[in-house]
Amino acid sequence: MAIPEFTMRQLLEAGVHFGHQSHRWNPKMAEYIFGARNNIHIIDLAQTVPLLHHALQAVSDTVARGGRILFVGTKRQAQDGVADAAKRSAQYFVNSRWLGGTLTNWKTISGSIKRLRHLDEVLNSGDANAYTKKERLTLQRERDKLDRSLGGIKDMGGLPDLMFVIDTNKEDIAIQEAQRLNIPVAAIVDTNCDPKGITYIVPGNDDAGRAISLYCDLIARAAIDGISRAQGESGIDVGASVQPVQEEIPAAAQPAGFQGLAGPRGVADDLKKLTGVSGAIEKKFNDLGIFHYWQLAELDHDTAHRIGEEVGLPSRADGWVAQAKAMTAEAE
């Protein structure tokens, strides 16, 4: 195996280049911003590509040395991707609320992990029958609560050697703890974030579901590459090289060729101003990740028609695109 390859086209299709509204930017990200379009900052992917490759190399090298990678992503749209990637690459993750002291107070966290293991043993053995139904329910709730916070790190056995983070603003406490312990941090840094203290900066959209899935997939594959290298260096016959399956990045329920947003960039546009769009249709647009006129204005004929079919009014699609272009032009 080798470091996973990716193209700028993949990044574009995943919406990695979309930053936040220009008035919400962090000036410290200026060097990574290509420009602005419709008041949305555009990230310079010419810099993202080599920086992401550098981060992937760091992950692979860390795992090849026997190190541990901790995936951290507690925002809703990152939770599943972070957990799946960590499990697939035999690494560790936190995808629920970050508990203060997870790294800096590892001794206490280890005690909680020990309690989680004990509860698993009790509830999965015949000993559970010694408790009343109410007591078993209480133990199960305690176990579930601990598992949400610690289930992804209960087998880590010590501090991680590198931490991969989605959304540095949301995970600022985790990053501070890593910095105090000199643990390298690789992170996706959006235009509203502060890159200070991040060891491996990867400028990119930290909100779009497809972008997050792409990051997690690449980091997982880099970790798997590190495992393969470690086995090879230790003399283990890993057999003939097998071309890894190129997984399609899930596009949720969105039409092909279109990348929606996980949420509006600032204040959502009133899509009901478009001809024939009711509140119900607007909700369908939102479910597809469409919140702004500029998203519709950029659609080609085929993609617009597919979206029209999704919301139940394909005959209106071209008209919506034309109206959206006019409204976007007026806003400029």
Swiss-Prot record:
Transmembrane segments: none annotated. Pfam families: Ribosomal_S2 (PF00318). InterPro entries: Ribosomal_uS2 (IPR001865), Ribosomal_uS2_bac/mit/plastid (IPR005706), Ribosomal_uS2_CS (IPR018130), Ribosomal_uS2_flav_dom_sf (IPR023591). The keyword Endoplasmic reticulum does not apply. One of its GO terms (cellular component) is cytosolic small ribosomal subunit. GO terms for molecular function: structural constituent of ribosome. GO terms for biological process: translation. The keyword Ribonucleoprotein applies. Keywords: Ribonucleoprotein, Ribosomal protein. Belongs to the universal ribosomal protein uS2 family. This is Small ribosomal subunit protein uS2. It comes from Nitrobacter winogradskyi (strain ATCC 25391 / DSM 10237 / CIP 104748 / NCIMB 11846 / Nb-255).
